[in-house]
């Protein structure tokens, strides 16, 4: 596991200002790995992907009362039905707890995540590996970073694997787009995504893109 001290420091600094740290970022950017870098003896880790965790958090107050650790990590919190309620109860009723919640950066744009946490949280947006972090990734160079991309797994790989990003894109659609926004046309999403990549840095004309891709403007 590659340690990323830059981000660990940002999390600790954010806790000094608010009880909740919202760690967001694109899929596979290293959010879960970063939570594992916290001292295990101080952390109560909850994987919200698991049905048992969802059931356990139906009564957030009871969950917090039974917690014996000073840090609670909710990994993939957007899998919960009402994540903002779980976080708000923790911040208001158990102010001594430090809470770290991870999830997709698209979650804030959904109705599922109402902004009822004003003054209670700080956001840390985990980016792909930055230039200043290359030293933490061993033999990674700027050239390799540009060729392999900035996600930790392909950056650590010895050879370029295009299938990783195809799998990543499929996962991004099924869990972040389809799951959160109920959008059910993967071929249209992929076409738009590739179009945006080709247009990177250029002007995006909605009407022109819709016509060229055969996608309606509202979509």
List each model region and its residues.
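Pre-Walker A adenine-sensing motif
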Residues: 1-15
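Hydrophobic positions on the alpha1 helix immediately C-terminal to the Walker A/P-loop
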Residues: 34, 38
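Short glycine-rich substrate-engagement loop in P-loop NTPases that contacts/grips substrate
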Residues: 44-74
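Hydrophobic anchor at the beta1->P-loop junction of P-loop NTPases
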Residues: 23
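Short regulatory helix/loop adjacent to the ATP-binding pocket of P-loop NTPases
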Residues: 107-122, 138-139
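Conserved lysine of the Walker
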Residues: 31
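Interdomain hinge/linker elements that couple catalytic modules in large macromolecular machines
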Residues: 125-219
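Conserved catalytic/switch belt of AAA+ P-loop NTPases
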Residues: 84-107, 115-116
């Amino acid at each position: 596991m590659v340690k990323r001290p830059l981000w660990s420091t940002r999390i600790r600094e954010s806790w000094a200002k608010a009880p909740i740290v919202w760690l967001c970022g694109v899929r596979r950017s290293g959010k879960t790995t970063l939570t594992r870098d916290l001292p295990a003896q101080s952390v109560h880790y909850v994987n919200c992907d698991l049905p048992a965790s969802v059931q356990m958090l139906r009564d957030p107050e009871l969950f917090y009362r039974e917690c014996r650790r000073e840090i609670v990590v909710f990994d993939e919190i957007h899998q919960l039905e009402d994540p903002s309620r779980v976080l708000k109860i923790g911040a208001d009723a158990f102010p001594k707890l430090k809470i770290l919640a991870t999830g997709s950066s698209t979650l804030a744009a959904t109705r599922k995540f109402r902004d009822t946490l004003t003054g209670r949280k700080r956001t840390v947006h985990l980016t792909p590996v930055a230039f200043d972090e290359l030293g933490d990734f061993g033999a990674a160079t700027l050239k390799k970073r540009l060729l392999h991309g900035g996600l930790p797994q392909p950056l650590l790989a010895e050879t370029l694997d295009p299938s990783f990003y195809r799998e990543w894109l499929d996962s991004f659609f099924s869990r972040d787009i389809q799951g959160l926004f109920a959008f059910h046309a993967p071929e249209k999403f992929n076409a738009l995504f590739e179009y945006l990549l080709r247009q990177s840095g250029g002007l995006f004309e909605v009407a022109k893109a819709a016509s060229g891709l055969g996608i309606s403007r509202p979509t």
